[in-house]
C-alpha cells in the first residue's frame, strides 16, 4: 500500500474540490495513484471536473521572440516573485531569448551550458537558485505572439491576418486549449473520457445501452471544449473560434502556450510555524 501523504490529499482536494475525507478514501482505494483517484471520483460523482494540469507554483518569467517564419518561447525560473522582477534576472532572460532566436532550433541543454557561467554568477550575487527550464519553437507562414504579464506566453502559427492570429493567441492564453481542432484530439484521450462518461451514466441508473448512446453527444461537447477551434471565442462568446477565423479569412495550423511554473510544485511553508520554530516559541 502506497503512503497517502497530507500533501497528496491536499493536491487532490485542490484538483477536484472534494472534501478531505473523500479525497483520502479515494487515494486509499487507488493505492496512491492520484490520476486513478480522480477518474474514480468523477465516475462516482464526487468530482464533477478535474484539472489535469499540474499546480503552478514556481516563479519566473516567459520571454518571446519572433524571427522569419518562426517564433520561440523560453522560460526561466527562480524561487521568489521578488527575484522574478530583478533587473539582473530579467536581463539574463532577455539574453537567453535573444540567443534562442539567433540560434534557431537550439536545445535546452545547449542554452543551459552556454549561460551556465552567467547563471551561476547571478545566483551567487542574489543568493537564489535560477534555472533555464524550457525553450520551444513554432514555425509557420504567419506567426503571432501574445505575452501576458511575463507569466504566460503564446505563439500561434497560421495563414491570413497576423492581427487576427494575435487575438487568437490572447484566447489561447485565457482558455488553455489542448488541441487545434476537435478531430485532432487523440483516440486515447477520447476513449479515456468516453469510458468515464459511460461509467457516470451507468452509476446514475441508466442501462448500458442507453448510457453508450448518451455519451456520444457528450463526447462531441468534450472534443470541442479541449480544442481551439471548438471553443467559444473569448472576445465574442456567441461564436466559436473556428467560425470566427472563417469570418476573417484566417486559419491556425498550430500553437504553443507556456505558463511559468507549469507542473512544478513549490513547497508551501507555514509562516507562523516557521517564526515559532526560529524564536523557539511553540506555544
From Swiss-Prot:
One function term, GO molecular function aspect: translation elongation factor activity
Entry's localization field: Cytoplasm
Pfam family, any one: EF_TS
SUPFAM superfamilies to which the protein is assigned, alphabetical: Elongation factor Ts (EF-Ts), dimerisation domain, UBA-like
Involved in Mg(2+) ion dislocation from EF-Tu as annotated region, ranges: 80-83
Gene Ontology cellular component list: cytoplasm
Record keywords: Cytoplasm, Elongation factor, Protein biosynthesis
Primary residence: cytoplasm
Functional note: Associates with the EF-Tu.GDP complex and induces the exchange of GDP to GTP. It remains bound to the aminoacyl-tRNA.EF-Tu.GTP complex up to the GTP hydrolysis stage on the ribosome.
NCBIfam families cross-referenced by the UniProt entry: tsf
Membership in a protein family: Belongs to the EF-Ts family.
Name recorded for this polypeptide: Elongation factor Ts
Record organism: Histophilus somni (strain 2336)
Amino acid at each position: 500500500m502506497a503512503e497517502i501523504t497530507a500533501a497528496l490529499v491536499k493536491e487532490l482536494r485542490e484538483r477536484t474540490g472534494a472534501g478531505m475525507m473523500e479525497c483520502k478514501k479515494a487515494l486509499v482505494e487507488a493505492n496512491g495513484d492520484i490520476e486513478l483517484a480522480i477518474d474514480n471520483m468523477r465516475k462516482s460523482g464526487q468530482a464533477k471536473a478535474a484539472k489535469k494540469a499540474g499546480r503552478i507554483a514556481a516563479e519566473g518569467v516567459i520571454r518571446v521572440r519572433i524571427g522569419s517564419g518562426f517564433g520561440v518561447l523560453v522560460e526561466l525560473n527562480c524561487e521568489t516573485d521578488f527575484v522574478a522582477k530583478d533587473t539582473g534576472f530579467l536581463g539574463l532572460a532577455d539574453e537567453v531569448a535573444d540567443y534562442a532566436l539567433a540560434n534557431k532550433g537550439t536545445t535546452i541543454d545547449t542554452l543551459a551550458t552556454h549561460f551556465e557561467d552567467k547563471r551561476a554568477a547571478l545566483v551567487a550575487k542574489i543568493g537564489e537558485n535560477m534555472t533555464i527550464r524550457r525553450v520551444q519553437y513554432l514555425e509557420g507562414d504567419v506567426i503571432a505572439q501574445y505575452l501576458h504579464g511575463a507569466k504566460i506566453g503564446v505563439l500561434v502559427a497560421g495563414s491570413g491576418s497576423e492581427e487576427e492570429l494575435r487575438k487568437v493567441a490572447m484566447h489561447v492564453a485565457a482558455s488553455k486549449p489542448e488541441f487545434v481542432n476537435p478531430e485532432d484530439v487523440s483516440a486515447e484521450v477520447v476513449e479515456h473520457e468516453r469510458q468515464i462518461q459511460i461509467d457516470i451514466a451507468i452509476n446514475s441508473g441508466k442501462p448500458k445501452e442507453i448510457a453508450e448512446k448518451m455519451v456520444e453527444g457528450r463526447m462531441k461537447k468534450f472534443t470541442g471544449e479541449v480544442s481551439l477551434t471548438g471553443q467559444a471565442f473569448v472576445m465574442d462568446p456567441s461564436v466559436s473560434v473556428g467560425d470566427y477565423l472563417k469570418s476573417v479569412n484566417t486559419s491556425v495550423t498550430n500553437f504553443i502556450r507556456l505558463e511559468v511554473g507549469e507542473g512544478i510544485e513549490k513547497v508551501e511553508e507555514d509562516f507562523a510555524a516557521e517564526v515559532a520554530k526560529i524564536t523557539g516559541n511553540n506555544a
